[in-house]
Regions:
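Short helix-perturbing small/polar motifs within transmembrane alpha-helices
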Residues: 27, 106-153
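Hydrophobic transmembrane alpha-helices
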Residues: 2-72
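C-terminal transmembrane helix-loop-helix hairpin of multi-pass membrane proteins
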Residues: 135-142, 146, 163-214
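Structural signal for the C-terminal ends of transmembrane alpha-helices
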Residues: 25-35, 120-125, 205-209
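Membrane-helix interface motif
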Residues: 151-164
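Hydrophobic cores of alpha-helical transmembrane segments in multi-pass inner/ER membrane proteins
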Residues: 18-25, 111-120, 189-203
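Hydrophobic alpha-helical transmembrane segments
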Residues: 17, 42-47, 67, 82-86, ...
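Alpha-helical membrane segments and adjacent membrane-interface helices in multi-pass membrane proteins
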Residues: 55-114
Length: 214
């Protein structure tokens, strides 16, 4: 889920270049912000990145797979969570899950789920137990990620910058609409699965390792 399995040469050049620029800008800012973090935080980043990589390699149906992005966002926060998303997407690209040119866009799409997860969880945790708060956090985080994915698809369907600025590509808009209509049921299925997994893991951590939770 929330990952573009698109080969190199398909997306407009300007789009994936912008994706790389934004992804590396966010990664540089996160690296600078966390430059004095404790070593165990980096260990947790590596461990959760490995879990995310494994989850994203196992499909649960057409078009979708688990991502563990909400869980990673809750445990690591927006900055380290985005670094995990970037590293995982780069590794998946080397394994053939999408081209190298879409790594930046994939990091942004997955980062859209990671970044809001901890703030939303903290807000919900004031009124809910960890498991239930995690489930609702997963739904909200993945909604942001799917929205980012649809934005990328819509921009890709517009083709070059001239078509985008002219806003006259009706065929591209229709193609985007068909994709949204076709894919929505699969996103719902994946979101439910992600919410259940996130809820289960957070409930477990709350009992055995509560210090890991924000």
């Amino acid at each position: 889920m929330t990952h573009l399995h698109i080969a190199d040469g398909v997306l407009p050049t300007w789009l994936w270049i912008v994706g790389f620029a934004l992804a590396f800008a966010f990664a540089a800012g996160a690296s600078f912000h966390h430059r004095h973090d404790r070593p165990d935080r980096l260990t947790l980043l590596a461990a959760l990145g490995a879990v995310m990589l494994l989850a994203m390699s196992v499909p649960i149906g057409p078009l979708v797979h688990l991502s563990f992005a909400p869980m990673v966002g809750i445990l690591l926060g927006p900055g380290l969570g985005f670094l995990a998303a970037l590293l995982v997407n780069a590794t998946l690209a080397l394994l053939g899950h999408g081209g190298l040119t879409v790594v930046g866009l994939n990091a942004l799409v997955l980062g859209a789920a990671v970044a809001p997860a901890r703030p939303v969880y903290r807000l919900l945790r004031k009124r809910m137990k960890p498991g239930r708060a995690g489930a609702f956090t997963a739904v909200a985080a993945l909604a942001c990620s799917v929205a980012a994915l649809y934005v990328v698809i819509a921009l890709a369907n517009r083709g070059d910058l001239a078509s985008l600025l002219a806003d006259d590509d009706h065929a591209g808009a229709q193609a985007t609409g068909r994709f949204v209509l076709f894919s929505s049921p699969f996103w719902v299925l994946a979101t439910v699965a992600e919410a259940l997994v996130t809820s289960s893991v957070l409930s477990f951590l709350a009992r055995v390792r509560p210090e890991l939770l924000p």
